[in-house]
Regions:
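Flexible loop/turn segments at secondary-structure boundaries
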Residues: 22-24, 44-47, 67, 94-96, ...
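Glycine-rich dinucleotide-binding loop and its adjacent helix/turn
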Residues: 45-124
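Dinucleotide-binding/catalytic capping subdomain of oxidoreductase cores
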Residues: 100-192
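N-terminal Rossmann-like dinucleotide/flavin-binding domain of flavoprotein oxidoreductases
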Residues: 1-35, 185-192
Length: 192
């Protein structure tokens, strides 16, 4: 699995359950390393203030990611996979990653570090369509190129006809190479 391969890399050490401030200090880290990077992820969810956000079956993408990554606080999360269509609000990396997991072949996921309880639920999933809805258009989307490539390589992704027209329009005006690359991938997708 991913962490098994990484742990065999020369010069790589992975420590779990270490709390900076309790087990060691920031100064201790700097004493032994040239740089210290804190990669802790988003500290909290950002729930939308919309009607129905508190209903059963509604979860934040951060909660779903914690669920399929095996975080013990989210192992019992009720992730509703008993319907054919799921909607994800937002178009950042986490949204695309959740869409990729929900549409992935469970046999492919079995070769990853996905949590066993999530894999079992995904094997029984009735989800056949994932809709990503966002307030920003394609050129202002928050996802990165690798996340887009990961999703489009793993799933049959199509765009709403209006979004497809926006992509083509934005592509004509794109001067940023990264935005242009994202738009070129989106332009090749079929219409919904």
């Amino acid at each position: 699995r991913l962490f098994d391969a990484m742990s065999r890399e020369r010069g790589f050490t992975f420590y779990l359950n270490v709390e900076v401030g309790q087990h060691l200090s920031h100064a201790d880290l700097l004493e032994h390393h040239h740089a210290v990077l804190y990669a802790v992820g988003a500290p909290t969810d950002r729930r939308l203030a919309v009607e129905g956000a508190e209903l059963p079956g509604v979860a934040t993408a951060t909660e779903v990611v914690a669920w399929y990554n095996g975080h013990p606080d989210y192992a019992g999360l009720s992730v509703r996979l008993d319907h054919e269509r799921v909607v994800i609000i937002g178009n950042g990396n986490v949204a695309l990653d959740v869409a990729r997991i929900l549409t992935a072949d469970p046999d492919d996921l079995a070769r990853t570090d996905i949590a066993d309880h999530a894999l079992a639920a995904l094997r029984e999933s009735k989800v056949r369509e994932v809709v990503i809805a966002a307030r920003r258009g394609p050129v202002h989307s928050a996802f990165t190129l690798p996340e887009l490539i990961g999703l489009t390589a793993a799933a049959d992704v199509v765009l709403d006809a209006d979004d497809h027209a926006l992509v083509l329009q934005d592509l004509q005006n794109a001067d940023d190479p990264l935005s242009r690359s994202k738009l070129e991938i989106l332009a090749k997708l079929g219409d919904a």
